[in-house]
Every structure is written in C-alpha cells, then in structure tokens.
C-alpha cells in the first residue's frame, strides 16, 4: 500500500536578483579540470558549499539545488577528473586521488573553510577530504553513503555502461531506438527501488527523467561511467578511519536500496559529531524525488537550524557519539 505523502509546505524561496557564474580552470598532477563558482548579490549566511555529486552528475547537474541555495551561500560545482569536461582519471587512481583533486578547488578559490556535500559516488570523496583536512571543513553532508557497495549492484551498473559503450549500430556510436531504451531502462532499474515505487514520491516522473537522460548518453560517457563503477568494486569506498573533528549530516531516502538506511547509519556512526536521519517517501534519488525537502534539509544543517520534528524526515539520531 502506498504511504501518504508527508505534509510539508516549502518555505518561500526568494531567488537573488543577480547571480554570477565563474568557470575556474584547475590542474592536478597534470590533469585538467574545471569548477563553477556561483555567487549572488546577497551576503552569504554560511561558508561556501562545494558539491561533489554522483558518477553521472557533472557540474551542471544540480539546477534545482542551485536555484534554492544560491541566495544563501557561494556554491562550487566541479567536474573532477573523469567527469564532464575534465581529463580522464587513470583507472588505477582511487578515491584518495579524487579527494586531493577536490581540495585543490578550495585552495585555488582561496576559501579558508567550506561546507562540503558528497552525494552517492561523491560521498567517499567528501569523506576522505574531511578526514585529511578537517580544519578546512566547517560542515560535512553525506547523502547516500556506504562503507561497502553491494558488489552485485555495482557489477550490474558497470555492465550496463560497458554494454552501452560497446553496442553501436554505426561508426558514430548511436544505437537503435530499441537498444537505447533497453540500456536506459537497465540503468534506471539499478538506481531506483522499483519494488517500492508506490511508496516513493514522484517515482514515475523521476524514472522518466532518468530514462531520457540515460538514453542520450554517448559511448564515451558510458565508458567513463563504467570506469567509475569499477573503482567502486576495486576497494571499499570509505576508509576505516573515523572523523572526529567535523560536524556532519548523513542521510538518504527511507527506501534507498543502493546505499541502504543501515549502511548510511553505519557511516554516521564513524563520525563523532554526526546526525543521521532518513527522508520519507524517497529512495537513492531523493534529490529528485523530494527536491524542495532535500534543499531545505541541507540549508537547515548548514545554517545550524534544528532538524527535529521535520515532517519529511525521521527523527534525528546521533550514532557517532562515543559511549
């Protein structure tokens, strides 16, 4: 039976009258990449936010969150090596290398301290960045995080994108309509909890959106996605070391079967000053299924507002506190 949507009225979102975008070229160990710095005409209410997204997200992949947060703080989006416009990251390089490349962004922009958001594939990068330079991270947000990915799931993802890279009807790499829809459908099924779709907000809409996105992916991009998923299989995404000096929020959708609630809770338990909660009526794609709530939750945490009694989340837990 479908769950009733959580009753919640989003606050008024007053977009800034003017935003400015700057593309900043970066280089790390000979690899070229770029970040986007988005600022507004309003004074910031918290430290700049650096966003590290999933394997399928480039620096233009967060338009909804960008619109909702740009009035409150500078936003930094980045194509790390292996993503978007950046150079390819050698397959043997892991998440430690990506964390180093992410921290170059803060050095290049001259930020003493930042807020850091790591979502899905970006979570192990953000965790490592906070672990290595905790004094630079004011607050850490991890969405859809796990110490160890389900190897069957990751293998399925890798096979989907390897198949897209290999299957082409002609020299330009295009697929027939049937081939395109088959690959896109398989990709969507790896990210959404189809068994609970009647309990997930906007499940059908999000499935269609992702299907259209995946159907347009080129063989070159598919090869990159396959490499990203091989990286997840090569080693555990998160290190065993605890984070003791950074305040953190760890969350995901209550129906997430990519990084399960228990897996996210275990990540929160490895961070001394962590808060853990779940967003209701959502799965791994919570940023699309409940985008207003996603933005509200992040803004609340980054501006030190209470997270208690929110109608769209479970009660906050503090699993990282040492007994």
Task: Please place each PLM-identified region on the residue numbering.
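Conserved HGGG/HGGXW glycine-rich cap/lid loop of the alpha/beta-hydrolase fold
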Residues: 31-87, 306
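Active-site loop/oxyanion-hole signature of alpha/beta-hydrolase fold enzymes
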Residues: 31, 36, 76-121, 296
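An N-terminal hydrophobic leader/cap segment in hydrolases
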Residues: 1-24
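Conserved serine/cysteine hydrolase catalytic core
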Residues: 219-266, 278
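Conserved alpha/beta-hydrolase catalytic His-Asp/Glu region
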Residues: 151, 174-242
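Catalytic active-site module of serine/aspartate enzymes centered on a nucleophile-bearing elbow/loop
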Residues: 274-323
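Hydrolases whose catalytic domains are alpha/beta-hydrolase-1, hotdog thioesterase
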Residues: 125-129
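Flexible "cap/lid" loop of the alpha/beta hydrolase fold
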Residues: 131, 138-174
């Amino acid at each position: 039976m479908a769950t009733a949507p959580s009753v919640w009225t989003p606050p008024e979102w007053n977009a800034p009258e003017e935003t400015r975008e700057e593309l900043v070229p970066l280089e790390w160990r000979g690899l070229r990449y770029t970040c986007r710095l988005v600022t507004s005409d309003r004074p910031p209410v918290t430290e700049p936010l650096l966003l590290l997204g999933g394997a399928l997200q480039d620096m233009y992949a967060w338009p909804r969150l960008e619109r909702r947060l740009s009035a409150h703080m500078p936003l930094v989006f980045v194509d790390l090596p292996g993503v978007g416009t950046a150079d390819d990251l050698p397959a043997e390089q892991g998440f430690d290398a990506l964390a180093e490349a992410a921290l170059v962004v803060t050095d290049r922009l001259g930020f003493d301290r930042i807020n850091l958001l790591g979502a899905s594939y970006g979570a192990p990068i953000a965790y490592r960045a906070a672990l290595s330079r905790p004094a630079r991270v004011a607050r850490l947000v991890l969405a859809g995080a796990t110490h160890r990915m389900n190897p069957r799931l990751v293998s399925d993802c890798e096979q989907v994108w390897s198949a897209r890279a290999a299957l082409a009807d002609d020299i330009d790499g295009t697929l027939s309509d049937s081939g395109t829809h088959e690959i896109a459908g398989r990709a969507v099924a790896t990210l959404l909890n189809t068994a609970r779709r009647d309990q997930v907000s906007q499940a059908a809409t999000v499935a269609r959106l992702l299907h259209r996105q995946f159907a347009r992916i080129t063989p070159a991009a598919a090869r990159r996605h396959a490499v990203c998923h091989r990286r997840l299989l090569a080693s555990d995404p998160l290190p065993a070391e605890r984070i003791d000096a950074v305040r953190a929020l760890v969350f995901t959708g209550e129906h997430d079967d990519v990084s399960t609630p228990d897996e996210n809770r275990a990540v929160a338990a490895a961070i001394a000053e962590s808060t853990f909660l779940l967003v209701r009526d959502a799965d791994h794609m919570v940023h699309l299924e409940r985008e207003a709530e996603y933005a509200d939750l992040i803004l609340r945490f980054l501006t030190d507002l209470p997270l208690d009694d929110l109608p769209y989340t479970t009660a906050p837990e503090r699993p990282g506190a040492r007994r």
